UniProtKB/Swiss-Prot annotation:
The gene is prx9. The chain crosses the membrane at residues 6-25. GO terms for biological process: mycotoxin biosynthetic process. It comes from Penicillium rubens (strain ATCC 28089 / DSM 1075 / NRRL 1951 / Wisconsin 54-1255). It comes from the Eukaryota. This is Cytochrome P450 monooxygenase prx9.
Length: 579
């Protein structure tokens, strides 16, 4: 019978039946693959990576807010279908299914792992475990970068983007000084109003100002109001650089996920304009700095010596000369990496600092210890005739503060899942506790998701994992000389010894290049604030509720962020009774 003559109802029913059969056949195929691996597995109707999962997530999340805030996690029937479910689950699912297991649907397989040794192995085999293109393409709104490239392209990018973060480049000194300056501006602003403030807004302002200066050499006053950002538009532009930066960083998620042509047709038109204008500004800056360097290879910005833009262009020119080419990075590649610096240097750092400030407001005992250390470092500087701190002389002195920072990184990692995939059948090694290593073969196209939260909250690697203990980063090594170099071992050295057990900055062959840049900004800003003030909860904030919600809920941004409602206050240390 001619299909075109079938009744509509019969046609729809037949089509639906064929679709279901097609899905069942695919599911049976992938279940067979899962069985062949020898790993435990569970079957779900929809994976978090599928379009339907991404569509359902914003609709379903609000329905379970109360349950999630109590630390109950997701119901079993829905958890693997929710995008970024791992934060709310912590280790719960791995306690049920094991440290390494598969999730199977009709669209494929995902291998989730909370095995630190396996994770370390995966992160070091970067040519076998690749980044899924669909997950990382969104990080290229302006061009390819060191986070999205693979193989030879990655090697090329890292040769140019790594040198700007070395201590000798001046970038870490620059970010230390600018973070301290912006923190002082923050304190002045808070002290003048003498009230509780929107913490997330102020921390975001601070980190935006820091990355604008250290990234592009452009000064942004912390106290600049949003209304003022609209002024001073140069000829040929539709908005000021600062306004474009403000909009792009504020609406980063929309810019990464929504096509520009859709934004232009909706109420998000101004965001689309900011996206385009920021690109225009950055291209102009690239061309100006390139021209300056072509005249003088040792050129440095008079104000922002060591800024990332100039450093990347210089490294690119050096790479080109070494390879006998006219240029190394294209303009798009420079632009792509500048955007990555903006994303990491603004959003990731802002969220990490926000979690730190909230934690100190909740834990005055920790704040006491950090203040004691801050005062001690300032006293040492004064004995040397210095009135201020700097990166070179003082960064490594903040042992307890460093430990606190890393505990915040552990408990509230910016990225909850590190995503990989295998392009061909690949052997993995699983390391069960108290058992011999076991090998399993993952089929081609299987995704491998390193569950950062499940590792960071794993008692096998972190005794009493829910407790924030800065001392765990120090122990006896903080005061023990290194026998080979006679150099004092600092807490930072221990962070390099926990292979695979701390993945805030990823790890292995593709560890974050800017981790020390972030650490410098974090400690500088915190030390500057705590030199004069204490951080306390704002009026009306319930400490128990705040703690419960920062541990179990998130704002749903590009990286992990707390809910926006938390209010804090700065109080002069002399005005706050402790003990």
């Amino acid at each position: 019978m001619d299909a075109s003559k079938l009744p509509l109802g019969s046609f729809v029913g037949t089509t639906l039946l064929l679709f279901i059969l097609y899905k069942l056949v695919k599911l049976a195929y992938y279940v067979g693959q899962a069985k062949n691996t020898g790993l435990p597995y569970t079957i779900v109707p929809v994976l978090e990576t599928e379009f339907l999962g991404k569509l359902l997530t914003p609709l379903i999340r609000p329905l379970f807010t109360s349950r999630l805030s109590r630390g109950k996690g997701w119901p079993r029937w829905i958890r693997f279908s929710i995008l970024d479910w791992a934060w709310e689950e912590k280790r719960r699912v791995h306690e049920e299914l094991g440290d390494v297991f598969l999730v199977v649907s009709s669209e494929g397989l995902i291998c989730y792992t909370a095995d630190a040794d396996m994770s370390w192995d995966v992160m070091n085999r970067r040519n076998e475990f690749l980044k899924p293109r669909d997950k990382y393409k969104v990080l290229e709104p302006y061009g390819p970068n060191v986070a999205t490239t693979e193989g030879k392209a990655y090697n090329f990018h890292v040769r140019i983007t790594a040198p700007p973060f070395n201590d000798g480049s001046g970038a870490n000194d620059l970010v230390w000084n600018e973070a301290s300056d912006q923190a002082r501006a923050l304190m002045e602003s808070w002290s003048q109003e003498n009230t509780t403030r929107d913490l997330s807004l102020d921390i975001n302002r601070l980190t935006l100002a820091v990355i604008a200066y250290t990234g592009f050499g452009k000064r942004l006053d912390f106290k600049t109001e949003v209304s003022d950002l609209r002024n001073k538009i140069p000829p040929g532009y539709k908005m000021s650089l600062h306004h474009a930066l403000h909009l792009v960083t504020t609406f980063m998620v929309k810019i990464l996920l929504i096509p520009k042509w859709i934004m232009k047709m909706t109420s998000m038109k101004e965001i689309a304009v900011a996206h385009g204008e920021l690109e225009k500004y950055m291209r102009e800056m690239i061309r100006t700095e390139t021209a300056n360097l072509s005249k003088d290879s040792e050129y440095q910005s008079a104000d922002a010596k060591g800024n990332l833009l100039t450093s990347v262009l210089r490294a690119s020119a050096f790479e080109a000369k070494a390879a006998g080419r006219k240029q190394a990075f294209s303009e798009d590649e420079v632009l792509g990496n500048l955007f990555l610096y903006l994303l990491a240097g603004y959003e990731t750092t802002a969220n990490a600092m926000t979690y730190g400030f909230i934690t100190l407001a909740l834990r005055q005992d920790l704040q006491d210890r950090i203040i004691q250390e801050v005062d001690g470092v300032y006293a040492e500087a004064a004995a040397e005739g210095r009135t201020s701190l700097n990166y070179t002389d003082d960064f490594e002195k903040f042992q307890y503060t460093y430990g606190f920072m890393y505990e915040v990184f552990r408990l509230y990692p910016g990225v909850c899942i590190i995503t990989k995939m295998v392009p061909k059948d690949t052997t993995i090694t699983v390391y069960p506790e108290n058992n011999s290593p076991q090998q399993h073969v993952l089929p081609a196209e299987c995704r491998v998701y390193l569950n950062v939260n499940a590792v960071h909250y794993h008692e096998r690697y972190w005794p009493d994992p829910w407790a924030l203990k800065p001392d765990r980063w120090m122990g006896t090594i903080g005061a023990t000389p290194n026998a080979r170099s006679n150099k004092k071992v600092v807490a930072g050295d221990k962070s390099r010894q926990v292979r695979g057990t701390l993945m805030t900055f990823s790890g292995g062959a593709r560890a974050c290049l800017g981790r020390k840049f972030t650490q410098s900004e974090y400690i500088s800003a915190l030390a500057t604030v705590l030199r004069e003030y204490r951080i306390v909860l704002g009026e009306g904030m319930d400490a128990k509720v705040v703690k419960q919600e920062i541990d179990h809920l998130a704002a749903g941004t590009v990286t992990l962020a707390p809910l926006k409602y938390v209010k804090l206050a700065l109080k002069k240390r002399t005005d706050v009774k402790t003990g």
